[in-house]
């Protein structure tokens, strides 16, 4: 037996060993375990390399480091709210908010997501309007600007925003940017050079520590937050790039959902940014200071919670919030997501609602952002139709919104898609909203989108080719690790 054969045997033994590690040592969902076993078994050696890059869980040390930075300045307020709601003494602003105290309590206990009731919220469904408003707020900034985006492209929109940030940094403002190392992988470091020379600070999230190899590649910071002077915050689905203004020939018009918030909910966005910055940066750590949490004299009436989730937690807070909302539905469930790949618990919750007579409507894109993932989406949509749920295909460009509206009373908007990746692997952030007027605006936007969609009927779905059916089956089988 030659040297090459010996090496091959060793690699195959290692492959079997890591397959065993996947099954017996790492705590993970059963469906994900079986998906990785398939990869390791049927793609030996290369499957092992893929597993090293995409399959390993964050170590206990990394998780501990994250948790050591959590809840800056809000621990006492969280504990007080939990106790007041438990004792039924919390001063809810209106009956609709009080009606959903169980959901509020769940998110408080799971994530420390404080309920704030004095927020003014503006809804954006168009990228031009969102970025015009964001840049106008940045232009008016007096003290600091904090941005975190999964994608920050160096194209026309990226340069337009960067010129403003460079100028504000040169004026002496505290300006910090976090971008995801994977999401913004095509953006060169030189793009930020003038910004940094002017005093701005920028950090990639989970960058590669080795050339061409990043063992944390699978854990992405998918959050999109902007905080200006601790006074105004933005949260939603728009990244920074020309395609989000509808400039992509592939996608055309880009339909997304974003919120501008003025009120105490901005405190939670600020806290989230501080935690992410202190994890991404080994220097220039941010301490809790009053400048980052100014006194509000709110005139708004929107009650909301800012909820974060990620692989640093075992609870999947946003998904649990979705399930609680769906279980509470009596009349309608309106759901939008570019990727609809629910795990068993979420899928069962939606099915039960549909079978109980709730009007369930799910909206997905008419074209793939990621072709392989899209086939899993259509497969799950087809299964859901069997329960009486209605599936709508958005046909006016690309739908990227991550929105859930229930009974016209509660809603969630943010960065989390309805898929395994958002619930288990990505760092996400969503707003959970309890004010009927704001929820009605989100419901109206959904119904307007239906006018630009066509319904996927069982008859239409049955006409897909054998090749499409095969791709759906394979994509669904591997969906827990996509």
From Swiss-Prot:
The UniProt record lists the EC number as 2.7.8.-
Listed under catalytic activity are: 2 a 1,2-diacyl-sn-glycero-3-phospho-(1'-sn-glycerol) = a cardiolipin + glycerol
Which Cys pairs are S-S linked? none
Q: Name one GO molecular function term.
A: cardiolipin synthase activity
What subcellular locations does the record give? Cell membrane
Xref: InterPro entries = Cardiolipin_synth_Firmi, Cardiolipin_synthase, CLS_N, PLD-like_dom, PLipase_D/transphosphatidylase
Q: Which GO terms describe its biological process?
A: cardiolipin biosynthetic process
Membrane topology value: Multi-pass membrane protein
The record's family statement is: Belongs to the phospholipase D family. Cardiolipin synthase subfamily.
Annotated function:
Catalyzes the reversible phosphatidyl group transfer from one phosphatidylglycerol molecule to another to form cardiolipin (CL) (diphosphatidylglycerol) and glycerol.
Q: What is this protein called?
A: Cardiolipin synthase
């Amino acid at each position: 037996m030659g040297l090459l054969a010996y090496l091959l045997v060793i690699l195959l033994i290692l492959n079997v060993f890591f397959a065993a590690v996947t099954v017996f040592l790492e705590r993970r969902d059963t469906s994900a375990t079986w998906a990785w076993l398939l990869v390791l078994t049927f793609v030996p050696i290369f499957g092992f390399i893929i597993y090293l890059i995409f399959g390993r869980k964050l170590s206990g040390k990394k998780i501990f480091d994250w948790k050591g930075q959590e809840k800056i300045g809000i621990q006492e307020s969280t504990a007080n709210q939990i106790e007041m709601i438990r004792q039924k003494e919390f001063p809810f602003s209106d009956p609709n908010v009080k009606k959903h105290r169980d959901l509020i309590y769940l998110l408080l206990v799971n994530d420390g997501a404080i309920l704030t009731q004095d927020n003014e919220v503006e809804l954006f469904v168009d990228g031009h309007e969102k970025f015009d408003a964001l840049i106008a707020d940045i232009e008016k900034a007096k003290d600091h600007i904090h941005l975190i985006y999964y994608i920050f492209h160096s194209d026309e929109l990226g340069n337009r925003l960067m010129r403003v940030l460079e100028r504000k940094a040169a004026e002496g403002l505290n300006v910090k940017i976090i971008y995801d190392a994977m999401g913004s992988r095509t953006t060169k470091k030189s793009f930020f050079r003038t910004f940094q020379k002017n005093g701005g600070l920028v950090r990639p999230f989970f960058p590669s520590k080795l050339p061409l190899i990043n063992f944390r590649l699978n854990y992405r910071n998918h959050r999109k937050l902007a905080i200006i002077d601790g006074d105004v915050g933005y949260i939603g689905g728009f990244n920074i790039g020309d395609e989000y203004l509808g400039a992509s020939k592939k996608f055309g018009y880009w339909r997304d959902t974003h919120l501008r918030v003025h009120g105490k909910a901005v405190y939670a966005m600020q806290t989230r940014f501080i935690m992410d910055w202190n994890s991404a940066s080994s220097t220039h750590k941010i301490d809790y200071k009053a400048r980052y949490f100014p006194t509000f004299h709110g005139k708004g009436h929107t009650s909301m919670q800012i909820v974060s989730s990620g692989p640093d937690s075992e609870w999947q807070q946003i998904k649990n919030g979705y399930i609680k909302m769906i279980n509470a539905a009596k009349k309608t469930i309106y759901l939008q997501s570019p990727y609809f790949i629910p795990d068993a618990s979420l899928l069962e919750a939606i099915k039960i609602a549909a079978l109980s007579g709730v009007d369930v409507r799910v909206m997905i894109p008419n074209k793939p952002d990621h072709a392989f993932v899209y086939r899993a989406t259509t497969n799950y949509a087809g299964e859901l139709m069997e329960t009486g749920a209605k599936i709508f295909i958005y046909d006016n460009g690309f739908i990227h919104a991550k929105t859930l509206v229930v009974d016209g009373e509660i809603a969630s908007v943010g960065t989390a898609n309805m898929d395994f990746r958002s619930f288990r692997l990505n760092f996400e952030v969503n707003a959970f909203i309890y004010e009927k007027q704001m929820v009605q605006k989100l419901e109206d936007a959904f119904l307007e989108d239906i006018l630009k969609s066509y319904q996927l009927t069982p008859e239409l779905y049955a006409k897909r080719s054998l090749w499409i059916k095969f791709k759906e089956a394979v994509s669904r089988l591997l969906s827990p690790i996509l």
